């Protein structure tokens, strides 16, 4: 019996539903002191003086530390595997606290008190003297001569620049009869809005620092804490229990280094830091706002002669994940619609906004909005159905990327497009809605494709480890460094392990928490990598454990290993399937045999030197109220080729979650900042327009299963892709309904009113 491919219940569902699941805050020592951070209320300034005497004198305050008290060990925060090559290491530009304020919310002091209320009161007693500096919020203005400089090491505020050149762009655009289509596209700064705010607590044990934290990347956080404190990494232990979502925000070391340092300054006493929602909004990480400029030179039949992309990514105040986001988005441009003559450039620049980091999609939602909006602009210029255009130009089967050398093994783009078009009746509806509409309610349909890599090879290391232990009752314990953050990977790993070893699903226990003292190494949850990369480690370890079990069965039965098999937790004879013994019987004998006691375990590391393309598309149907300037999404469908589905119900849930995120990206979500001060204006769940359940349309997920040949279980990326294509599909549906092209999201009523007025569709 194979468990891969079955919709088994989540292994953590009962504990979470019953409230038994223990998160970092639930595990916090009741004696722990509370630390609250003083965030600067300036966009750009030097801290000249901090007077904390009143705060220190308050009852219940244990200590106050300022930016002048902390060690000057610069460290990176991005959750990437360590590189032994200095040029590939993340930028180390952070201190525990800083005297150079680079955004409104930067950390300049911390109060440690016996309780949270006292700590908050003490913060209000701290007086700060600033030397104000000019600031810049716009990414292109930050690159202009004379703009305020944020980091001496990066002249012109440019953190990174990359380019792609293929063919001869200038020669190609001279071809007679070409149609030039040009557009500028903007995506906003948004926040992850995971349920659980970031929190951590730290203490000392045996001269070592222990941090219990809500993180996606425990093994990487250990290294970063060591760097920040200037101590050997082995002197740090990180424990990751259940966590309530992350979406990339927790793929940075956020406050773990500061929390760890505080316990070292307070005699090893436990100290906790828990972010308020307002802090999470603008003091953690945000999604990069990216401005894109695209020019396509198109033949009348829809084929491209030449294409150009320029994009500018707003990094905010610190490097975090840096230029990788813009570079990944740029690299998708020549792949999704191959063209022989390409010029691409991407820049990432510092501004005085909150640091931008990883967020679900890692640059692809921004690139997909710009790229897919542009494709519909091209189809409109050609007077061609957008589906027909994409049929002509989408990445073909057998395509090999010139740079990564990854190969597209399937014709998934077309399979997904056709499945979605048929299910939504797209071609008929598009033609119907394209006819002139004059009423106050107008309808339209739109579509968008996406492309996504699985993991980070060959840009960075991809490896994963797994340990399996045969317990005396015949059950299997599985440990891996890959992290469950709410997406369901523990369930998927249990299904994989059951198949790899040959035991029932119910007898597999995946240890959900990670502890860097005992858990095998894994990079963690990011890049939609865990099912693919972790699957290699589970398959390799499972095969090794199975081999050792059958070797011991050979000892007990005196039968050749080649005649034995392990099926559903039973040792059977291959020729006739006769059950020889239960695995529990073998395990007990192995543990307690006076003649040959064996603790049957297996551990293996898999280094992955392959990558897999995931493909898909979104189809949207909208209703536009021309009088109220409101968009109502009537139907949204995502179609995915994510390889073989390990658990179809979990896959569907992933898609629905991503579609919800894409809806907000399209219609409502945007962090706003005061242009005169740099202060965030809507850093809370009341003013930040996160969509509610009532705002969601009918959402559907379709899958075109196509087993990935490089994967031991046929899997590839699904975690992030569902968020990539809904926004441009909705934008394109509005174009179909109204004839008006919107080149920025979110498409709010205010934006609709302004554009409709410019187009002469509404009166004052």
Say what each PLM segment does:
Residues 207-209, 243-250:
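Helix-loop-helix module between adjacent transmembrane segments
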């Amino acid at each position: 019996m194979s468990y891969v491919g079955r919709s088994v219940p989540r292994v953590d569902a009962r504990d979470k539903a019953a409230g038994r699941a223990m998160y970092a805050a639930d595990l916090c020592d009741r004696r722990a002191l509370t630390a609250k951070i003083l965030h600067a209320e300036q966009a750009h300034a030097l801290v000249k003086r901090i007077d904390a005497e009143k705060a220190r004198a308050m009852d219940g305050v244990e200590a106050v530390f300022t930016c002048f008290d902390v060690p000057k060990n610069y460290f990176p925060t991005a959750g990437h595997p360590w590189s032994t090559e200095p040029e590939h290491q993340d930028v180390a530009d952070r201190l525990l606290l800083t005297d150079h304020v680079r955004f409104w919310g930067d950390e300049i002091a911390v109060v440690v008190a016996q309780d949270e209320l006292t700590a908050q009161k003490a913060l209000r007693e701290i007086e700060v003297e600033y030397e104000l500096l000019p600031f810049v919020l716009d990414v292109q203005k930050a690159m202009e001569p004379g703009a305020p400089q944020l980091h001496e090491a990066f002249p012109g505020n440019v953190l990174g620049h990359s380019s792609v050149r293929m063919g001869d762009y200038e020669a190609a655009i001279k071809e007679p009869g070409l149609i030039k289509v040009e557009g500028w596209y903007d995506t906003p700064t948004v926040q992850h809005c995971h349920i659980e705010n970031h929190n951590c607590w730290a203490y000392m044990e045996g001269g070592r620092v222990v941090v219990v934290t809500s993180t996606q990347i425990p093994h990487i956080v250990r290294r970063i804490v060591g760097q920040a404190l200037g101590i050997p990494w082995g002197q740090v232990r990180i424990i990751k229990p259940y966590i309530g979502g992350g979406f990339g925000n927790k793929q940075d070391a956020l406050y773990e280094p500061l929390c760890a340092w505080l316990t070292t300054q307070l005699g090893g006493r436990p100290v906790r830091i828990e972010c308020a929602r307002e802090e999470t909004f603008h003091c953690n990480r945000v999604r990069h706002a990216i401005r894109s400029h695209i020019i396509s030179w198109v033949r009348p039949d829809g084929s491209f002669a030449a294409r150009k992309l320029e994009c500018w990514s707003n990094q905010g105040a610190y490097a975090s994940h840096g230029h990788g986001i813009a570079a990944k988005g740029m690299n998708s441009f020549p792949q999704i619609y191959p063209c022989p003559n390409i010029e691409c450039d991407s820049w990432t620049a510092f501004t005085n906004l909150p640091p931008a980091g990883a967020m679900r999609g890692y640059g692809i939602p921004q690139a997909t909005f710009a790229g897919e909006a542009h494709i519909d602009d091209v189809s409109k210029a050609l007077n061609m159905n957008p589906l027909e255009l994409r049929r002509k130009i989408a990445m073909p089967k057998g395509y090999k990327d010139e740079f990564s050398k990854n190969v597209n093994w399937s014709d998934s783009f077309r399979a997904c497009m056709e499945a979605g078009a048929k299910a939504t009746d797209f071609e008929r509806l598009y033609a119907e809605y394209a006819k002139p509409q004059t009423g106050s309610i107008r309808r339209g349909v739109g579509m968008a494709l996406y492309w996504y890599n699985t993991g980070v090879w060959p840009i960075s290391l991809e490896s994963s480890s797994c340990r399996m232990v045969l317990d005396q009752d015949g059950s299997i314990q599985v440990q891996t460094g890959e992290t469950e953050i709410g997406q369901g990977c523990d369930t998927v790993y249990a299904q994989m392990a059951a198949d790899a070893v040959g035991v029932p699903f119910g007898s597999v226990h995946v240890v959900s928490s990670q502890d860097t003292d005992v858990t095998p190494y894994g990079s963690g949850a990011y890049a939609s990598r865990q099912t693919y990369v972790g699957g290699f480690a589970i398959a390799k370890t499972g095969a090794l454990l199975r081999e050792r079990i059958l070797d011991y069965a050979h000892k007990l039965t005196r039968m050749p290993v080649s005649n034995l098999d392990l099926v559903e937790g039973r040792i059977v004879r291959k020729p006739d399937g006769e059950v020889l013994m239960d695995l529990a019987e073998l395990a007990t004998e192995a543990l307690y045999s006076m003649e040959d006691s064996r603790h049957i375990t297996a551990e293996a590391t898999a280094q992955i030197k392959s990558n897999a393309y995931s493909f898909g598309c979104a189809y949207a149907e909208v209703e536009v109220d021309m009088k109220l300037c409101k968009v109502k999404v009537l139907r949204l469908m995502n179609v995915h080729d994510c390889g073989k589905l390990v658990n179809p119900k979990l896959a569907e849930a992933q898609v629905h979650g991503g579609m919800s995120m894409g809806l907000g990206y399209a219609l409502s979500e945007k962090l706003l900042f005061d242009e005169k001060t740099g202060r965030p204006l809507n850093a809370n769940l009341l003013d930040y327009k996160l969509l509610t359940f009532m705002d969601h349309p009918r959402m559907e997920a379709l899958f075109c299963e196509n087993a990935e040949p490089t994967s031991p279980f046929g899997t590839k990326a699904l975690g992030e892709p569902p968020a990539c294509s809904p926004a441009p599909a909705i934008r394109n549906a509005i174009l179909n309904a109204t004839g008006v092209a919107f080149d920025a999201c979110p498409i709010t009523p205010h934006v609709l009113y302004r554009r409709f007025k410019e187009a002469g569709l509404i009166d004052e």
